């Protein structure tokens, strides 16, 4: 069965439009990763840029350095996981298999 090059190009144009729309949607994503019962919260966008770091100062003085560093790491990893999940949800069924 021969493939019509014009049909292929039309499909590629559609794929490009889908990718452009997905990029716009991803740029709108904002998530908040949290750790230590909200002692540390990190806001991140869909491009994995940290937009805000919040620290509940009420608990800050009671933490040692290692515990505080671990909470920051956990909150950051939580935010990254949430961005990845949002991207997965927004791209599911939109891109052709394997992209």
Swiss-Prot record:
Signal peptide: none annotated. Its main location: cytoplasm. InterPro entries: YbaB-like_sf, YbaB/EbfC. It is found in: Cytoplasm, Nucleoid. GO terms for molecular function: DNA binding. It holds the Pfam family YbaB_DNA_bd. GO terms for cellular component: bacterial nucleoid; cytoplasm. Keywords: Cytoplasm, DNA-binding. Homodimer. Belongs to the YbaB/EbfC family. Binds to DNA and alters its conformation. May be involved in regulation of gene expression, nucleoid organization and DNA protection. This is Nucleoid-associated protein EbfC. It comes from Borreliella burgdorferi (strain ZS7). The gene is ebfC.
């Amino acid at each position: 069965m021969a493939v019509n090059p014009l049909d292929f190009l039309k499909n590629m144009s559609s794929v490009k439009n889908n990718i452009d729309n997905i990029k716009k949607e991803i740029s709108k994503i904002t998530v908040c990763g949290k750790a230590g019962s909200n002692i540390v919260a990190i806001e991140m966008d869909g491009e994995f840029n940290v937009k805000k770091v919040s620290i509940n100062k009420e608990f800050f003085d009671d933490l040692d350095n290692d515990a505080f560093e671990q909470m920051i790491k956990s909150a950051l990893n939580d935010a990254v996981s949430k961005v990845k999940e949002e991207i997965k949800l927004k791209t599911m069924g939109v891109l052709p298999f394997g992209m």
